[in-house]
Amino acid sequence: MTEKIFPVGKLPVELLSRLLAQAPVTDPRVLQGPGVGLDCAVIDAGETLLVLKSDPITFATDEIGWYAVQVNVNDIATAGATPCWFIMTLLLPEGQTTAGLAEGITQQVYQACQEVGISVVGGHSEITFGLDRPILIGTLIGEVRREALVTPRGASPGDRVLLTKGVPIEATAILARQFPGRLEDVLTAAELEEAQGFLYHPGISVLRDARIATHAGQVTAMHDPTEGGLVTALWELAEASGHTFVVDPAAVPIPPLSRRVCAAFELDPLASIASGALLMTVGAEDAARICRALEAEGIPCSEIGVVESGPVAVGRRTASGLELLDRPERDEIARIFEG
């Protein structure tokens, strides 16, 4: 019997769960190992905890070094940790690689790390058979005090669900940078430039968001919505915590420019790669204070739902009960790259 071939994107969650459950974790110092919705590993290093993350850049080719640092920083930030040490693996395409290409990507990584105070401590590079574009994989290690650790498992019934900035910031930037010709009839030249600039403003980093939020009140869980967008991130938090997430899709902030870009490609903005927004659950009594603290620093924050006791689920309330939000099988922009 022929095995099913999976499309571009994350592995099906059932397969991924099965694979991760088989991972050998025998060291008692591993406080958090692999699991669906768990952004980072956590290791007991004595006085502090080490937080580790690995993430590739596969959709974008423009500013790939910048992307690689930011997406790894984001996951370290969602643990409440400080990013410290970066390791890069750079796979370059055969028949296309020049000194300028290798130097350009490497300098992007160095600059992005310097801006956040990260040391680049090692890695690997090669020209790889079969690639048609560069692939960059980053591994980032951070530190956090034991009492300051935030994990995706921390959400509890009654917590409020908050989202910073809006979605999908990253998809907007990628589509505008990779496929500008397909937006020429939809956006003005100034609007196209603005959409391309979403990489930096509002930006795909959530490091400031996480630091401000955790200092302002009780943050019980944080997550960085990447592939599969906000809806996938909500499902991952629900699975990690074991609870039901009830959300109001109409309350999710979508920048007007993002809405127009997604419409031009016929994409669902809630299921498109969304780095730049911080998804978090917070104590009900702290929700307003955390939002005010973020907004005082120029970071919009919206309450989009609540955590309830019940089975793992993500949905919206209707007159007939909880209507589940379908979990995306893959990120929306994968269709564009395939086409």
Question: Where are the regions that the model predicts?
Answer:
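Extreme N-terminal cap/leader segments of soluble proteins
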Residues: M1-A60, A79, M88, Y110-I118, ...
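Acidic, Ser/Thr/Pro-rich beta/coil linker or hinge segments at domain junctions
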Residues: E3-S17, E295-G339
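General beta-strand structural signal in soluble alpha/beta enzymes
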Residues: Q32-G35, D44, V51-K53, S119-G123, ...
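Beta-strand->loop->alpha-helix junctions that form or flank phosphate-binding loops
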Residues: Q32-G35, P225-T226, T244-P253, A271-I273, ...
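Glycine-rich anion-binding loops of enzyme active sites
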Residues: D44-I57, T82-R182, V306
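Small-aliphatic-rich amphipathic alpha-helix that forms the alpha element of a beta-alpha
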Residues: T61-I87, G104-E115, R208-I212, T232-E236
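Active-site-proximal betaalpha loop/short-helix elements
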Residues: P93-T97, G197-A274
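Helix N-cap motif at beta-to-alpha junctions
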Residues: V282-A288
